[in-house]
Regions:
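Vicinal oxygen chelate
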Residues: 1-4, 13, 36, 68-70, ...
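Acidic/polar N-terminal loop/beta-strand segments that form early-domain functional surfaces
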Residues: 63, 73-75
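Glycan-recognition patch characteristic of GH18 chitinases/ENGases
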Residues: 86-88
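Core segments of cupin and vicinal oxygen chelate
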Residues: 14-67, 106, 113, 123-125, ...
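Acetyl-CoA-dependent GNAT
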Residues: 75-78, 147
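Eukaryotic phosphotyrosine signaling hubs
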Residues: 92-96
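A short, acidic/glycine-rich surface segment
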Residues: 42-46, 79-84, 150-154
Length: 159
């Protein structure tokens, strides 16, 4: 059995502290190539901000090994905070981000050695593949999955 993810260009991640979050994503996910990194008003976000135009800092960052990208976004006109609603798997939106690795066990050891907030040990996915779950600095959940479709031989454990 196999799986394919279709239609996701990149994953936007809202964080309260842009600098520390990006540092974590560089360290654990290899997101070290900025495509842009800027601060600007965000008029398209008014549906999420009760009609108010806010300013935000955003960086689109890329992992050169696997080609995945994420947009790290942090408001600058207010301090971001977690929702008062406790979301559950199956609610609207993306609940778990997914990151590829060439070796799940080596990735797990890297995350453990570097004191990441591991949510599981290495376990079997529904597809019978090794996987594990981790939380980032802002308690967002990520699943680390095996893959062999990488663009380069970059030495980072994830891609």
């Amino acid at each position: 059995m196999s799986y394919t993810i279709h239609g996701i260009q990149h994953l936007g991640v809202g964080v309260p502290n842009h600098e520390s979050a990006w540092k974590w994503y560089r360290k654990f996910f290899g997101m070290d190539i900025p495509l842009f990194n800027d601060e600007a008003e965000a008029p398209l976000m008014t549906i999420y901000t009760k009609g108010k135009v806010i300013s935000k800092r955003a960086a689109m960052v890329l992992n050169i090994k696997g080609g995945c990208a994420m947009e790290v976004v942090s408001p600058t006109t207010f301090k971001a905070s977690n929702s008062e609603t406790e979301f559950q798997l199956g609610d609207l939106g993306i609940f778990v981000g997914m990151i590829k690795t060439t070796d799940v066990n080596k990735a797990y050891d890297f995350f453990k050695t570097n004191n990441a907030k591991l949510l599981s040990t290495v376990l079997k996915s529904n597809y019978g593949q090794d996987t594990f779950y981790v939380k980032d600095l802002d308690d967002l959940i990520w699943q680390i999955l095996p893959a062999n479709d990488f663009y380069t031989n970059h030495n980072h454990i994830t891609g």
